[in-house]
Amino acid sequence: MPAIKKNMRYGHPEGHTDVCFDDSGNFLVTCGSDGDIRIWESLDDDDPKSISIGEKAYSFALKNGKVVTAASNNAIQLHTFPDGEPDGILTRFTTNANHVVFNTDGTRIAAGSGDFLVKVLQVEDSTQQKTLRGHSAPVLSVSFDPKDIYLASASCDGSVRIWKISDQTCEAVLPLLEKCNDVFNAKSICRLAWQPKSGKFVAIPVGKAVHLYDRDSLKNICTLSDDFITQPVNIVAWSPCGQYLVAGSVDGCIVAWNIATKACLERIKHEKGYTICALAWHPHLPQIAYTDNEGNLGLLEDVCQGDVKQPSAKVSSAETKDYDELFDGDDDEDFLNGDMIGHEGAVNDEDDDDNFTALTGRPRNRGAIFDDDISSDVPSLKLVGNENPVVEDDQASSVQNFTSVASVKLSYNGPMPTPQQKPFQSGSTPVHLMHRFMVWNSVGVIRCYNDEQDNAIDVEFHDTSIHHAIHLTNSLNHTLADVSQEAVLLACETTEELASKLQCLHFSSWDTSKEWMVDMPKGENIQAICLGQGWVACATSALLIRIFSVGGVQKELISLFGPVVCMASHGEQLIVVYHRGMGFDGDQCLGVQLLELGKKKKQVLHGDPLPLSRKSYLSWLGFTAEGSPCYVDSEGIVRLLNRSLGDTWVPICNTREHCKGKSDHYWVVGIHENPQQVRCIPCKGSRFPPTLPRPAVAVLPFNLPYCQITTEKGQMEEQYWRSQIFSNHSDYLSKHGYECDENFKAEAQKMQQELLMKMFALSCKLEREFRCMELAEFMTQNVMNLAIKYASRSKRLILAQRLSEMALEKAAEQASAEQNEEEDEEEEDFRSRLTAGYSRTATEWGDSRAKPVKQDQYEENNEEEMEEEEKEQEEALESNTPTANPFNKSVKTPDVSESKLGAILSSNQGRVNPFKVSASQKSPAFASNSSRSTSILDNMGKFPRKPSASGSPSTSKSDSVIIKPLAPKAKSKQGQATLFHSVQAKPIAKKTTEEKKAVPTPPKAAADIAENKKPKTGFQLWLDENRPSILSENAGLDESEIIKEGMSRFRMLTSEERMLWTEKAKGDYPGEDGADAKKRKRPEQENMASNGCPQENTDSGIAAAKKHKPLGQSANNKLSAFAFKKE
């Protein structure tokens, strides 16, 4: 029964037109000279979807939802199907590509072009290319062996070549075609094809016939021809089962043969006699789509059905009838359900089974089915509906062409291993390119030219003061290169004649020999190289890293855990990435080692896994200009080593976010931390740039992938942590003895604290007080004071109280850390002085005694200044249950730490001892004046209750007290927190009673202070003068808040202004004349008199006070004020 020919329809303008079915067979896809790909749901579809791919489309292929096209822009492009979205440019030619095909599983493509080249490349990684050279004229067509071992190509030079893909060698050259100088002048485009699945034959159109060549012997074993063909055959196409071959000729004839019988089954003539330029079999049905050179599209149905419907002459029983029904059936939807089995009866001779055996490789045992007891129950073997029947012999799938019959048995092979990434050099373009970048880094650019005219290497420096440009003849065929400010390093692969070589051009050498070369051992191939500061390194196929000095001295050898992928260096650092195992499901399994090769050699990263994006590979590896390791994967994610978080990797930029199109990429050439930028080259429709014209470098900003980056909170968080990460390199540089920009570090810290304060204010507005406390953890002491002030002004007193407690803890930690630092420094200095000029023999002086020595020395130097503070602390410890002291390291450490802490918080000018006084200033008044400096911030954090009515029983306990920084106060009932959470004691009853009498109301107490002419601090004088302005701006503040506001304003004064107020306070004693001074008792005498001690023993009383510790100094001062008032 002849095939049914549908009426042809217009598809594209006049010119070469290509056609194929998609994998499911639901769509017809065509391309033509108008540069469009059209997707047809059927031949009658009046509104096909169009995808524009260029000016003209010469060829295309469709597989696994991807369309690869050869357009007039000389590029092989990839698009998604059926969306038609661009998915990248796989490769480029210098002229038009004439034919492009997929392999069987869709992982590779092959393309032949007019520049005589055939390229084979991976779809997922276009950098893995193989170039087949040998044709001397434009390539007409290419075809993959279904086993992916061979590739066949036809050319205008009159030859058909069979290539072995793995080693890019030509296995055979078949001079079968007529020669011509261009594709347009060729009598036939010679679309050859391999037999599906087995690949046993390759069909080649030769004149008016089709030659079949054997795969193994590459000899012509059969020639298919027919008198119906009067012009040269243009194209051949195999049925998916491999049993039928169809050919289209230049004069519009379509002929189909049965390969087993060599019989011609179909003869169809084009209605207008136009040239047939494309043929495609339906994957499931007996249909063939074809196009002509006028852009028309046609369809043939029921192709070769006459061959399968002849009854078998061998079998006549009922069982055989059922058997034939099982495999033949009348299910027309699955064309080869009956086709592949029934074709044997087409020829009634005894060689049927032999022919079938020759094609399948295994005879079918029909007796096994006939002898089965239940074989007569044939309907039980049929599947429900129109599904495919179960075929007992699984080898029949090699004969049955369509996937519906191939296997009913389901199986899972487990995760598929990912091919390992090949070694590469960072900043280089693929090796197969004739003009390529061997390296592009922060020092210079190395280009390689490898064509018929020249094979050379050019070295160009960004800064010509380093060295002038260098031109080298690439006689050794170097493929790897690196450049630094000291040398140029080159390496070549091993060949049959020469060993792999490492060549170094040491242009910074002071002698006349500026070049050296070393050969690798036999069989060892260099795969990666890099240049460090004073050393070079190369990684070889023997899983070794060889270290040389820059002058050529062999140094360390390092064994790798797996094959190297890439290597980079910066100064003394060397980073190596290698395969630590087999990856699965498209993922690479890479490990990384980071070594420091300076004087103190150490390994920082010990083969840790290298994190990559899903289904990606490493595309760039190196260091920032400041020396931090970083890398980029194929998805455009840039990651940096975060040394402050246990040497972890953090993503800092996504270059794909800046690409305009899906096929665009950025080719990274360098990264800087100050300023924060990625230097890269934009590549439109490709992954790497061409060498000419010279590409322009673009700059991309860093952007950490934080959540809610569009909100104000997310932006500030991202800015804070980005600044934190990129200011860490200064610590690393200073630790290793490099110069670092202190201004940069200060500016970064300033910006971080500003961001923290902004986030703190935002959280306060949102009533997120717990979040405010979390943000305060990162604040410095000064910024935390601002936060306390902001919280107080925002009427968030609980938050301010908690911030005060946190400030105490942080100050305590800071003081403790500084004290330990001083102890370590003094310990080192003490021992170095003892052993200066002598041997290092161990003695008792070498024991760890730094802590008591430090404490004794500190107490000896500061005994007089700290005397009054010690008495108050001891009194508090005796009269009250001790509070947890964060400074408590030993018996006397709290006193030392308390005094140091006061110094830290009272001044921003370094660690100055505010208690340092001369011997003539040891009066109680001055001692109390000194103690005031530690109590000002203490009183800032207190929020006293409002005084109750006069005469109430609670007046003595909760009465509003004037905040006097000169003396410590007793705790109120609720024990509110202070900024300085130091140990406070409950005073004895006598002291409390006298205090009540001495300070009944704030105005009177102030008058007493003025009357007694007690010395004031500079801050008190300033506060007295500026108190009205503070109250006018902030009405309703109580005394504690006034002092806090005053303290913040006083700190804003310059150091000179503060010093003036201090000097003014020291000179504010005159107010009494000499006579009054003689008449009036001295404060020490008043203290002794009020305590019942004789006046003449004042000095001895002071000495006795040291021993017996009667009362604190603050109590004595208040008692003296009380005694004077009573007079």
Swiss-Prot record:
UniProt KW keywords: Cytoplasm, DNA-binding, Nucleus, Repeat, WD repeat
One example of a Gene Ontology biological process annotation: mitotic cell cycle
Protein's name in the database: WD repeat and HMG-box DNA-binding protein 1
PROSITE patterns: HMG_BOX_2 (PS50118), WD_REPEATS_1 (PS00678), WD_REPEATS_2 (PS50082), WD_REPEATS_REGION (PS50294)
DNA-binding region coordinates: 1013-1076
Biased amino acid composition, Polar residues: 881-891, 918-937, 1087-1100
Domain of life: Eukaryota
Low complexity compositional bias, start-end: 948-960
Species of origin: Xenopus laevis (African clawed frog)
